[in-house]
Every structure is written in structure tokens, then in C-alpha cells.
UniProtKB/Swiss-Prot annotation:
<dbReference type="GO" id="GO:0005829">
    <property type="term" value="C:cytosol"/>
</dbReference>
<comment type="similarity">
    <text>Belongs to the AIR synthase family.</text>
</comment>
<dbReference type="GO" id="GO:0046084">
    <property type="term" value="P:adenine biosynthetic process"/>
</dbReference>
<keyword id="KW-0436">Ligase</keyword>
<dbReference type="Pfam" id="PF02769">
    <property type="entry name" value="AIRS_C"/>
</dbReference>
<dbReference type="InterPro" id="IPR010918">
    <property type="entry name" value="PurM-like_C_dom"/>
</dbReference>
<dbReference type="InterPro" id="IPR036676">
    <property type="entry name" value="PurM-like_C_sf"/>
</dbReference>
<keyword id="KW-0547">Nucleotide-binding</keyword>
<dbReference type="GO" id="GO:0005524">
    <property type="term" value="F:ATP binding"/>
</dbReference>
<comment type="pathway">
    <text>Purine metabolism; IMP biosynthesis via de novo pathway; 5-amino-1-(5-phospho-D-ribosyl)imidazole from N(2)-formyl-N(1)-(5-phospho-D-ribosyl)glycinamide: step 2/2.</text>
</comment>
<dbReference type="InterPro" id="IPR036921">
    <property type="entry name" value="PurM-like_N_sf"/>
</dbReference>
<keyword id="KW-0963">Cytoplasm</keyword>
<dbReference type="InterPro" id="IPR016188">
    <property type="entry name" value="PurM-like_N"/>
</dbReference>
<dbReference type="InterPro" id="IPR004733">
    <property type="entry name" value="PurM_cligase"/>
</dbReference>
<dbReference type="GO" id="GO:0006189">
    <property type="term" value="P:'de novo' IMP biosynthetic process"/>
</dbReference>
<keyword id="KW-0067">ATP-binding</keyword>
<protein>
    <recommendedName>
        <fullName>Phosphoribosylformylglycinamidine cyclo-ligase</fullName>
        <ecNumber>6.3.3.1</ecNumber>
    </recommendedName>
</protein>
Amino acid sequence: MSKQSLSYKDAGVDINAGNALVDRIKPHVKRTTRPEVIGGLGGFGALCALPTKYKEPVLVSGTDGVGTKLRLAIDLNKHDTIGIDLVAMCVNDLVVQGAEPLFFLDYYATGKLDVDVATDVVAGIAEGCVQSGCALIGGETAEMPGMYHAGDYDLGGFCVGVVERAKIIDGSKVKTGDALIALGSSGPHSNGYSLIRKVIEVAGVNPATEQLAGRPLADQVLAPTKIYVKSVLELIEHVDVHAIAHLTGGGFWENIPRVLPEDVKVVINENSWEWQPVFKWLQEQGNITRHEMYRTFNCGVGMVIALPQADAEKALQVLKAAGENAWLIGQVEPLNAGEEQVIIR
């Protein structure tokens, strides 16, 4: 008896589906191109030149995912904005150091490739790249039978940016008296989703049908992470920014100290902005303490910027002209023995 001739497809890997995906995403990728990009998709490595305007360029890199927000997106069958989240988590980490994002790569892994779903995801990644001005120059689509449950996939993002060495923002210029400006978030962004999913479970609600402030809860918890790149780069052109903190995992308590010298603290007035309804709902339904809210969520603030008090009003004008919700929320003060570096009152 002759043996059956096996193929890669028999093992669960469909190369034709992968090729179909590449064809489907090409128009989306094309939207993101920059003049520095050399060549197109399909090479073994993606090529990108440095912009010529930099005298002493320093490369800044970052990698991130979207956590269990992806689980919620899969469960609610909404795949078109999770790619924006993926880009946002990477490029926002770059711009806080003054860097302009140059290029982005993605990793998409699944048990069985669904070309329609993957196209939606990559279209979102491309949209995030357009919003941040960086080029989507490559990626990896891994079809791995037996590694994921049916319908599941995972994402990773990788970004490289560039900053003039003399203009790196590292927090070293922060000093007592500096003003703190907050940039409004679009919602929980991409952090705290294991707790969000737990609260939804305990509350016993369906996010697709549960209404909150006139909108489905699903729309509010899956709102794409705000990309601040263009607004922040515009701000840097107009004022002397001393530090920027991207409020991600760890919230206020852990992210703001990352950009502070050891001898100062920040004092924040929590009445200077208002939590969006989704945060109030989460706190109420989950009976979450105030401290835990500020540790897990951004509570309506995506970034905190420290700059000279004399520049605060100008900074607010620049940011609002760029389309941001921005508020003066506090100031930098000397750190006394035994104090925490972040005080919210």
C-alpha cells in the first residue's frame, strides 16, 4: 500500500492564504510609506534610511503588545482598531523621549490564518502608522497549528524612531516649580484589561448591549489608544519640554517617577480633570479603591508633561490647537524624606 503524500497544508499551514493576505494588505501598507523607505514588502529585510535633517541622530526603539484587550476584541469580533492600539503602545513610548517614529514592524501569530480578520488587524496597524507618521515596512505572519485555540491570535509590535542627540528628553531637566500638563486619553487605552474583563464578568453584563452614557460599553472599552506623536512633536518645537510620562501599566504611581529626578515629587490636583464614564463605571462595579484605580488605569490621562511654569499657557494653546484635550493638573515640588514621588489630592 502506498503512503499518502502529505503537504504543509495537511499539517495546518496554508501558504496560499498567507500569500493572499500579503496581496490584501499591500494597499494599506502603501498608505504609510515615508521617503526614507527603500524598496517594498517581500524582501528578507526591510530597508530604511535616516532622515537627512538630523545632525547627530540617535535611534530609539521599542516593542509592545496590547495585553488582554486583544481577548476582548476577539470575543466581541472587533478586529479593525486593535492594530491602532498596537502601534500606539510603541510610538507613544518613543515620542516621550522626543523621538520621531520612523518605521514599524508587526508580528501576527495564529493557529489557523483567517485572511479577513488578519486584513482588518493590519489595516488598523497601517492606520496607526499613518496617525504617527511612521512607515509599516515589514512583519511576520505565523500560522502555527496546535499553538492557539480556534479563532485566537496574538500580536507584537516593534518600532524604531530617531531623535537629535541634543534634544533627547530624559527627565534630567525637571526641577521644582515645573508645571504638569495632562493629555486626555480616549479611554483605558491598552492597560488594565484583565481587571476590566473581571469587572465585566462580576457585573454580569454584555459589553455589546450594555449602555453607558448613551454609548455601548464595548465601544468605550475598545476605543483605540490615542496616538500623541504629532501633537507632542509639535509641542516640542514650541516649548522646552522637561519630561513626558506615558501612563501605561502601573498608572500614575509607577510611570511618572520613571521620568523624575530623585529629589522631586509631583503634586497633582485630581479635580483638574474629570474621569470618563467608563472609569467611574469600572470603579463602581468592581468596588475598586482609588489607589488601585490610579495604579491600574490612566483614569482619563494618557500622558503627563513637565515643563517650565512660564510656558504652561503656551503649551496648552499649542496642544489644544493640535486637537488634544489638555489640562494643567499640578506642579513639581521638592521631595521630603519619607514621601512618595507622586501625590494626588
